[in-house]
Amino acid sequence: MKIYLVGGAVRDSLLNLPIKDKDYLVVGATPEQMLQLGYRQVGKDFPVFLHPKNQQEYALARTERKIGLGYGGFSCHASPDVTLEQDLLRRDLTINAIAQDEKGNLYDPFNGIEDINARLLRHVSDAFVEDPLRVLRVARFAARFHALGFHIAAETLALMRQISASDELNALTAERVWQEVDKSLGGPHPEVFFEVLHQCGALEVLFPEIFALFGVPQPEKWHPEIDTGVHTLMVLAQAALLTEDKSVRFAALVHDLGKALSPKEHLPKHHGHGQKGLPLIKALCTRLRVPNETRDLALLVSDQHQNVHQAFELRAETIVKIFDKADFWRKPERLTQLILACTADMRGRTGFENNLYPQGEYLTQCFLAANNVDIAAIIAAGFQGAEIKQALNLRRIEAVSQFKQKMQTKLPTDER
């Protein structure tokens, strides 16, 4: 019985990155032996055990055989006869197929260390194509290690295209797809995740609403990058620079879905695209089972981002209506999220990356003025029932109007 540290912990150690989780591989043992040593079995499909003291995962060496569609369509064989190399052979990438024994010796049968040094994401074997989830995993690794200079091997990208052209991606559950998206949205370069999916053909299969944006033109005056798909990923990249909030990043990703529905005869203009995109966002979120709060923010950003861009031109009454519709009175954090997403939208254009976004501070001050209206004073003045709401609305409009009069700075309207 031999125990090895495997997977991400070994890889991240070689990259001098912090190690989050440690996974161990046990060669030459049976489930009965593990139980006798005090380990607790938790794996249903294959033998995985928790250490009796530190609760870390220890998996018995196994091989896998493809028997059906999807990432779950495998038959696993765990036995004391399965060797270290046989277990490592079933892994996705060479950089994840390195083992370290208890004395610190490294075992690298597939040249993962060489690929780490070359900053290369390369598949271990042609069995890579048997698991469609690996398309998403490789895209996530490409995004995660983008700043370190990693790129996908041409032959691996070819296999990812092969998977995308088959029916395998459709066998992935919504939960697994969203899990990979969620992890990528939390990383430093989520835009790379979607760029890779676009390159290998998976974006069209899994995210057709986003894929449809590529090739759709925008006015060059406001969008020198022209292509809406390119703009979308630029906005996502800017959102990642502005905030770690994954809901804001997702909202940035889907804020322009409605532009794919603009009539061709009207291009490159996209009148009302924010509202046109709402059904698309709802459908995408339902399909992927996106959390409700994330979905609701995405809908808000799509619906209101054009108004936010034109904030200096809006009447006080319109501004208060926006605050009412978004229920910022009870959820003021949503205003901050909306402004962050709109700032990313403004900066996600060629040549605009470092521009200021005064609309954000302007709307924040408008909200503070409106929210400062004293409801108790309205009630004390004798208003009752529906009159209270009407009086509150009028006083909020007046508060915003007075603030607007103090403002001197005006920006030209952006038709984005």
UniProtKB/Swiss-Prot annotation:
Co-factor binding details: Magnesium is required for nucleotidyltransferase activity. Nickel for phosphatase activity.
**ATP-binding among the record's keywords?**
yes
Give me the residues that bind CTP, please.
G8, R11, R91, R137, R140
For this protein, the record's Gene3D superfamilies field holds: Beta Polymerase, domain 2, cca-adding enzyme, domain 2
Q: Which cofactor does it need?
A: Mg(2+); Ni(2+)
Q: Which UniProt keywords apply?
A: ATP-binding, Hydrolase, Magnesium, Metal-binding, Multifunctional enzyme, Nickel, Nucleotide-binding, Nucleotidyltransferase, RNA repair, RNA-binding, Transferase, tRNA processing
* Additional facts recorded: A single active site specifically recognizes both ATP and CTP and is responsible for their addition.
Biological role stated in the UniProt entry:
Catalyzes the addition and repair of the essential 3'-terminal CCA sequence in tRNAs without using a nucleic acid template. Adds these three nucleotides in the order of C, C, and A to the tRNA nucleotide-73, using CTP and ATP as substrates and producing inorganic pyrophosphate. tRNA 3'-terminal CCA addition is required both for tRNA processing and repair. Also involved in tRNA surveillance by mediating tandem CCA addition to generate a CCACCA at the 3' terminus of unstable tRNAs. While stable tRNAs receive only 3'-terminal CCA, unstable tRNAs are marked with CCACCA and rapidly degraded.
Protein name in the entry: Multifunctional CCA protein
Query: What organism does the record attribute this protein to?
Result: Shewanella baltica (strain OS185)
Q: Which gene encodes it?
A: cca
